Curated annotation (Swiss-Prot):
One of its GO terms (biological process) is negative regulation of DNA-templated transcription. Signal peptide: none annotated. Negative regulator of class I heat shock genes (grpE-dnaK-dnaJ and groELS operons). Prevents heat-shock induction of these operons. Keywords: Repressor, Stress response, Transcription, Transcription regulation. This is Heat-inducible transcription repressor HrcA. The keyword Transcription applies. Belongs to the HrcA family. Residues 300-334 are annotated as: Disordered. It comes from Bifidobacterium longum (strain NCC 2705). Disulfide bonds: none annotated.
Length: 372
């Protein structure tokens, strides 16, 4: 019973510190929470929690504040992600439903998430490595150069220059393009590269073998290039309101390292809990600039049958945890939505907002409204 009560005290300390950002004392806990014990008992519990590394006392006469370990315990035991209110859901749908393209939807999502959370929002464009080929067009632009225009199932349009020894006839290039589109439709870029090499080696394509091999190299390069993902960021101005001004410079440096940030949040979005949201706190990220920050991330992508968009309410909340898990498992993440803020962020609210925006983008992709 003592350990169970002690953890209730820890939860109360974390909740109060998130709300006030001031050290929490036993008197306020006794007054504001129904813990069923005296202030003296709570003081003893807080001292024990400090010994166990969940709390620290910044000053001798002050109350306690959570440590990274304390926040982790709190986050891991959040029973559910708090659903958004009906008004919040309507607001998200209203703002994001005006998107006219994938890029517009991603930019709007970053701005909206930042406004909801009061933190930095980061939204990545769909990964080329996880996208499938919809169409490729090859256009001669110089004596020995072709421009390959690649369109994926997520609406991404990528361009890649192809340098070749000599330019084949336009009819032969078009015939190769048609064959590639027929055989590679719906394949990943890496699988498309393998298929194009097979086409290059087959009879009848000798005149465009160099073009085909170069196109296969381009597919492989695009599939492996993490920098090909665009990162949409909003809300860095919110950092100016941080009380920990000394932490701002390294945090801004971390936000500039987009490849590192992309890898961190992409990995986190794939290591999610049952609600489909991942949380990393402080040193867990192994990134010096984020030592005093927390990151909340969720993947978005294609929906399977059980995770299809919820009609006119793509951010409608599942009614049960099993529904949430079903929707999470039926969505193949191809990019992420994330929020970066202080370790004393409102985790429950941030997780709800991140999940809602991720679900909207999943619906957006599933409905095919991705043309730029």
């Amino acid at each position: 019973m003592t350990q169970s009560r002690r953890m209730l005290v820890l939860r109360a300390v974390v909740e109060d510190y998130i709300r006030s950002q001031e050290p929490v004392g036993s008197t306020s806990l006794t007054r504001d929470h129904d813990l069923g014990v005296s202030s003296a008992t709570i003081r003893n519990d807080m001292a024990a929690l400090e010994d166990e590394g969940y709390l620290i006392q910044p000053h001798t006469s002050a109350g306690r504040v959570p440590t990274e370990k304390g926040y982790r315990y709190f986050v891991d035991r959040l029973a559910t992600v708090v659903p958004l209110s009906e008004a919040q859901r309507r607001g998200i749908n209203s703002f994001l439903s005006g998107s006219v393209s994938l890029k517009d939807a991603l930019q709007r999502s970053a701005r909206l998430l930042s406004e909801i959370t009061g933190q930095v929002a980061v939204v990545a464009s769909p990964s080329l490595a996880k996208a499938t080929l919809r169409h490729v067009e090859m256009v001669p632009v110089a004596m020995t150069t072709l421009l390959a225009v690649v369109i994926t199932d997520t609406g991404r349009v990528a361009q890649h220059g192809l340098t070749i020894a000599s330019m084949p006839a336009v009819d032969e290039i078009n015939r190769l393009s048609n064959t590639v589109n027929e055989q590679c439709d719906g394949l990943s870029l890496s699988k498309s590269a393998e298929t194009v090499r097979s086409i290059a080696a087959s009879a009848g394509y000798e005149s465009v073998r160099g073009v085909a091999d170069t196109l296969a190299d381009a597919f492989e390069s695009m599939a492996l290039d993490e920098r090909a993902n665009e990162l949409y960021m909003s809300g860095t101005s919110h950092l100016a309101h941080s009380r920990s001004l000394a932490d701002l410079a390294p945090l801004f440096d971390a936000l500039e390292e987009q490849v590192v940030l992309m890898k961190l949040m992409s990995n986190l979005s794939e290591e999610t809990n049952a609600s489909g949201v991942g949380v990393a706190i402080g040193s867990e990220m192994h990134t010096p600039g984020l030592l005093h920050a927390s990151v909340v991330s969720s993947g978005y992508g294609r929906s399977g049958a059980a995770g299809e968009p919820a009609g006119n309410d793509p951010v409608g909340e599942p009614e049960t945890e099993s529904e949430t898990e079903s929707q999470t498992n039926d969505t193949e993440p191809i990019a992420f939505v994330g929020s970066i803020g202080p370790t004393h962020m409102d985790y429950a609210a941030t997780m709800a907002a991140v999940r809602a925006v991720a679900r909207y983008l999943t619906a957006f992709l599933s409905e095919g409204r991705t043309q730029d």
